[in-house]
Amino acid sequence: MMGLNQFAPWQRSVLRLPGGVTAETNTLAGGARSARLIFLNIAMLSDGGVRIPALWSTPGTVMRTLLATGSPVAHPSSYGHQTLVDVLAGIMDRYRPTLIHTLDPDPDFQVHDLLHPKDNDQPGCSDHRDHTPVALFTWKAIAQWVAASTRRDKSAPRFTTTAFRGYYNQRWPHNLPPAVLAQKARVIKSYGGAPDWDCGNAAGCGDYSQGGLRPLRNRKGWIRSTHYRYPTSLPAPTTDAQGRLVAYGVLGTQAVRWRETAPGSGRFGAPRGLGGGPLAPALATVRDSAGRQVLFALRFAALAGQGAGDLREIVVLEQRRPDGPFRAWTGLGTPESDPEHGRRVGCPAAVATPDGRVHLFVRTADKGLATRVREANGRWGPWQRLGGTEIQDGLTALLDAEGLVHVLAPGRDTVHHWAQERAGGPVALRRPSGLPRPGGDPLGAAVAPDGTLALVYRTPTATVPAVHGETSLTVRHFEGYGAIAAHTVAEPSGRREAKTLLLVGRDLGGEVQVQYGTGPDAKPLRSPGHLTPVGAPALLADDGHQGVCVVGLSPDATPWIWRPRPTSRA
């Protein structure tokens, strides 16, 4: 990854942190690249058999560090709950990251039985018992850093976050194609090391349980998937009355809005803060029938630990009038009455209907679907459960050619589908679709040129997707991985009224790609700038000022715009 010999020496030093804590830091530089590792060295099992879950949840818990052989750190440190939060927040403030990766703070509930052995899971959940508190400490530190920076600097720090599922990967279909899996395996092999490596470190040369071919041979298959806890596409693009591209996203755990500097300029201005945080990187946006923008987000309503509540809630921000100011954020709660179940609620998905209603959908703690509807008069109805089971997060909500609501989700067995039978009617679970088993990433869906609903997704471990509508068709050249977005657009040939399906996603190297059409001769187009988004890119396709726009967020927390032309070369 650094372009250096795997045994290149690291520069070791001591870092002094809040609370009198000291940590070891290792630095490696190679040309324009550099890496810094900070080892807090909190013991997995501290004095008295104390583990990090107790440091999160039990007041008064203290854990000691474990000094590594040969470490420049001379004395162990002690961590209480707030000490660890202060240390993490201090590290963030010192180094000002633009992208923070975390573990899953709210893992799925998991039944453990003969068919689903517990293995390395914590009781009742699909992740390791240490992963969850580490993620919670990180998110609490993020919130503290943002609050302190905002008070000091009058603005929130600019960064984005990505949270990864953990042992969840064992429980669901694998979603990485062979080429991407091979890249991941090479990195993990280097991390795992081997006892016979001559690395010059008396403490050892890797996490040997992850070395060699062990991860690929492990029946649990953790390596064979990469699932996001918040699998939405951000930023979410739309347009304003002047024809400028507008994008909504989450930056520094706060909602923000970017506007294009001028119609068609291809550049966003500075972000405008909309507040609402601390928010997960999960945002859904719709424009209601009156032209007002409505934003939905998932908020960390409480990150207390130490025996206090950890709460999540869906929140909404609504414009007073088209292109006008926003009202205050409003909490919509969750469909769950128990806070522990509320933590497992998924990312919001929404769709606006011509009758003035706005339909909000979320995945529930029991892996089904729930909805809440804003009526045309602006009043929100109660949460309602719509049934279903064993779906993954990453819902797709859209209207069909008749204006009826559809919701689609990747299930363990097939695609799960809810829909209206008539305009204004309830959204209800449909009979099993019988479609091939999805790999688990969010599904692409659009009204096809023939007026039917077309679904686009990859099956487990597949490199190319298929389009499922009246018939099924493999999209043979659209090689990649992850979520796919779809939209029907004007055909590049320019023939009057001719339409085709447009796809956007990531190629096998993670770069954004689009493809006009799904036939055997259609080829993907890639951006001249080799744009690589954090998470999934978003697609806007309209018949007005914008045409086709792809929007994404770079690792430096800067949004970009790509307006692909059908003549671009792959």
Model-inferred region functions:
Residues 1-39:
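Glycine-rich phosphate-binding loop and adjoining beta1-alpha1-beta2 segment
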Residues 48, 108-111, 368:
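Short, well-ordered, mixed-charge alpha-helical segments that flank or form enzyme active sites
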Residues 9-20, 64-233:
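Metal-dependent de-N-acetylase/amidase catalytic core
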Residues 42, 166, 388:
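Active-site donor-binding loop signature of nucleotide-sugar glycosyltransferases
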Residues 26-83:
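Active-site/substrate-binding loop(s) of hydrolase catalytic cores
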Residues 219-570:
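A structural motif
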